[in-house]
């Protein structure tokens, strides 16, 4: 376990609090709390932008910002509901983060969307003269910083952008933020798996509590030996 992961560990009291709403009612998360925590979706950075402050649960003595799992879960639900309204093949998921290559590819496969991993081809959204020009209806981005080219192009042509964002994120040109650890390998796998499953639930392609055949591990980028 890394030092950052140790800093992000929660006490039993904190875990109990995160399973209740602000009014004290017990809430049901999309996956068990411990599943979220073990994947590290809540682990932020040692900096926090003004916009992201509202998603922070705690600031550790070491200066690590810890995200509120309840808000991550809530935002995943809202994003899935929004994305379910689009024609599947018009949803484009993008990432330039290597740890997100597999999650994004599997996500697009499960929801029957499209994916661009690695370097985003400049002008692909804004220049109709390019042979590889595409016209998606919505973009799902992994990181507002590293996927800025795609996000800026989408903004220019009026394509809405849903993006995962850590505590240090600048969210210009992003229409809807899902606060989360968008740098960790296991975190990215779980986030994209949950989002994919919830989109299928919202489309009613699977029951409200139905499962998909793919496992979270199938969404995880493998480390090179």
Swiss-Prot record:
Gene3D superfamilies: Glucose-6-phosphate isomerase like protein, domain 1. Belongs to the universal ribosomal protein uS2 family. This is Small ribosomal subunit protein uS2. The gene is rps2. Keywords: Ribonucleoprotein, Ribosomal protein. One of its GO terms (molecular function) is structural constituent of ribosome. GO terms for cellular component: small ribosomal subunit. One of its GO terms (biological process) is translation. CDD domains: RPS2 (cd01425). It comes from Sulfurisphaera tokodaii (strain DSM 16993 / JCM 10545 / NBRC 100140 / 7) (Sulfolobus tokodaii). Pfam families: Ribosomal_S2. PROSITE patterns: RIBOSOMAL_S2_1.
């Amino acid at each position: 376990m890394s030092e950052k992961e140790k800093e992000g560990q929660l006490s039993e009291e904190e875990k109990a609090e995160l399973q209740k709403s602000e009014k004290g009612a017990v809430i049901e998360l999309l996956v068990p709390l411990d599943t979220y925590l073990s994947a590290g979706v809540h682990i932020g950075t040692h900096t926090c932008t003004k916009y992201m402050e509202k998603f922070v649960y705690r600031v550790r003595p070491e200066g690590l910002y810890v995200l509120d799992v309840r808000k991550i879960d809530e935002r995943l639900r809202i994003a899935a509901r929004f994305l379910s309204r689009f024609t599947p093949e018009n949803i484009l998921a993008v990432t330039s983060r290597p740890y997100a290559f597999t999650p994004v590819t599997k996500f697009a496969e499960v929801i029957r969307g499209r994916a661009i991993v690695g370097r985003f081809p400049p002008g692909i959204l804004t220049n109709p003269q390019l042979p590889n020009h595409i016209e998606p209806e919505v973009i799902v981005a992994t990181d507002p910083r590293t996927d800025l080219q795609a996000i800026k192009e989408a903004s220019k042509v009026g394509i809405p952008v849903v993006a995962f964002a850590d505590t240090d994120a600048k969210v210009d040109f992003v229409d809807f933020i899902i606060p989360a650890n968008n740098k960790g390998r296991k975190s990215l796998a779980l986030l994209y798996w949950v989002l994919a499953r919830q989109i299928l639930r919202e489309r009613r392609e699977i029951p409200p509590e139905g499962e998909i055949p793919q496992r979270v591990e199938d969404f995880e980028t493998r480390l090179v030996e």
